[in-house]
């Protein structure tokens, strides 16, 4: 293996963050990147090691990675992640935590490089085949993928594991062996340790053939993307919701393709055929007076005003009151709802000295809002403003004392309106 493949993959990238576990694959990747940096002095290279805490050897792996990076003069970031049982399984949860840490560590203009190779590609394809995936899932991994507002590069994807090992031995590289890689209770390990050796013994070029099939599936997906682009434009609103009316006249196959692409745009996991059918039957086609909801982990699909919404699951906060004693500073909201802030310039009056400030999520009685005649209950205002039901007890309401002043981004009450130019605005960073 030469540096040619790597150079081609990274031709336009000058700031690189390399995922570095210390194992064979990532050690070869980092070594290749160090050689690339030597040939291109304008390249900035960093490495990141994820400490999952799953192995008793995890601390020694950190020390190994620190030693390697110090020798190669590569700045190393070590991120420790905590894995809790979220129903995904340990492999999927570890991967999720790992890539979340990658995304948080990337600097502006930096790309992420990972060490997946041809054998990994074959395993990914077979796992997708086992799940009954369609062309999107069978496309497996690309050499370049969008990630966290930048790119995820897989420069070694055309190389075999055997080739990487030959390179490492030839150059005297040292790497760690994760004992969990020998546990064939994990699906990927089962394929690598037991299934693929048999397949390659019979058909030596099996991984390369699988990679070609994955490439063909990816090409079919790109063609479908082109053919369905106009449909997607018609169906997706500026808020990112999916309009149902255009879908009603589509064939089942076309509609399913649109649903998959919409969910992909919302960064949702790829749904199974059964999941798509449930979305359509239980949510899209629910009774007009229903408020259908389908849970997917910590996310939900809901329907409102003939549109599908992909949202984060948040418990209602109607009984919650959050005191805001120092209203000049931002206030953190409960349940991951973000922060609120009162900033100078706006149509809200400032609180009087004797008024306490708080955020609540319900308001009793009739409310008089700026720009409307007469009083209305909060429920009626939500309906008039087109606020979806699940946002009605999670939208921050600003109170001075017992007086409702404003709902973030929705309305201002007459009691809260500024009478001079010294007003403030309620800004909600959800």
UniProtKB/Swiss-Prot annotation:
- Assigned keywords, A-Z: ATP-binding, Cytoplasm, Ligase, Nucleotide-binding, tRNA processing
Assigned GO CC terms: cytoplasm
GO molecular function, a single term: ATP binding
Per the record, the major location class is cytoplasm
Catalytic activity field: cytidine(34) in tRNA(Ile2) + L-lysine + ATP = lysidine(34) in tRNA(Ile2) + AMP + diphosphate + H(+)
Gene3D superfamilies given for it?
1.20.59.20, HUPs
Question: What sort of enzyme, by top EC class, is this?
Answer: ligase
The protein's matches in Pfam families, at most eight in alphabetical order, are given as: ATP_bind_3 (PF01171), TilS (PF09179), TilS_C (PF11734)
EC number assigned by the record: 6.3.4.19
By its UniProt entry, which SMART domains does this protein fall under? TilS_C (SM00977)
Annotated ATP binding lies at 21-26
A GO term (biological process) for this protein?
A: tRNA modification
Compartmental location: Cytoplasm
Free-text note on domains in this protein's UniProt record: The N-terminal region contains the highly conserved SGGXDS motif, predicted to be a P-loop motif involved in ATP binding.
Per the record, the similarity remark reads:
Belongs to the tRNA(Ile)-lysidine synthase family.
| Role of this protein | Ligates lysine onto the cytidine present at position 34 of the AUA codon-specific tRNA(Ile) that contains the anticodon CAU, in an ATP-dependent manner. Cytidine is converted to lysidine, thus changing the amino acid specificity of the tRNA from methionine to isoleucine.
Q: What is the official name of this protein in its record?
A: tRNA(Ile)-lysidine synthase
Q: What is the lineage of its organism?
A: Bacteria, Pseudomonadati, Pseudomonadota, Gammaproteobacteria, Enterobacterales
């Amino acid at each position: 293996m030469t540096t040619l493949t790597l150079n081609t993959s990274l031709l336009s990238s000058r700031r690189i963050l390399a995922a570095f576990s210390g194992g064979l694959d990532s050690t070869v990747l980092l070594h290749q990147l160090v050689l690339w940096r030597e040939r291109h002095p304008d390249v900035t290279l960093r490495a990141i090691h994820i400490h999952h805490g799953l192995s008793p050897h995890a601390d020694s792996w950190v020390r190994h990675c620190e030693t390697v990076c110090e020798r190669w003069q590569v700045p190393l970031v070590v991120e420790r992640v905590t894995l809790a049982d979220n129903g995904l399984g340990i492999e999927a949860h570890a991967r999720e935590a790992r890539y979340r840490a990658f995304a948080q560590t990337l600097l502006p203009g930096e790309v992420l490089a990972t060490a997946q190779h041809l054998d990994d590609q074959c395993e990914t394809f077979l796992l997708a085949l086992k799940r009954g995936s369609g062309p999107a899932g069978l496309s497996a991994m690309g050499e370049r993928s969008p990630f966290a507002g930048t790119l995820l590069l897989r420069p070694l994807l055309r190389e075999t594991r055997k080739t990487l090992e030959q390179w490492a031995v030839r150059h005297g590289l040292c790497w760690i062996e994760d004992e969990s890689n020998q546990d064939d209770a994990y699906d990927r390990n089962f394929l690598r340790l037991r299934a693929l050796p048999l397949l390659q013994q019979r058909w030596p070029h099996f991984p390369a053939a699988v990679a070609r099939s994955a490439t063909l599936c990816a090409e079919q997906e790109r063609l479908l993307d082109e053919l369905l682009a106009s449909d997607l434009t018609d169906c997706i609103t500026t808020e990112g919701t999916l309009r149902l009316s255009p879908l009603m006249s589509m064939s089942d196959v076309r509609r399913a393709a649109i649903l998959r692409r919409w969910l992909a745009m919302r960064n949702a996991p790829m749904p199974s055929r059964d999941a798509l059918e449930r979305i359509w039957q239980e949510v899209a086609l629910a009774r007009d007076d229903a408020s259908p909801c389908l849970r997917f982990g910590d996310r939900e699909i809901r329907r409102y005003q003939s549109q599908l919404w992909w949202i984060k699951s948040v418990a209602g906060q109607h009984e919650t009151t959050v005191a805001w004693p120092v209203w000049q500073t931002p206030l953190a909201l409960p349940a991951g709802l973000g922060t609120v802030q009162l900033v100078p310039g706006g149509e809200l009056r400032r609180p009087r000295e004797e008024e306490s400030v708080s955020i609540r999520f319900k308001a009793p009685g009739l409310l008089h809002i700026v720009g409307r005649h007469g009083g209305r209950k909060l429920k009626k205002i939500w309906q008039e403003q087109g606020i979806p039901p699940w946002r009605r007890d999670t939208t921050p309401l600003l109170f001075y004392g017992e007086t409702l002043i404003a709902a973030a981004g929705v309305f201002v009450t007459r009691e809260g309106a500024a009478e001079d130019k010294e007003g403030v605005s309620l800004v909600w960073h959800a």
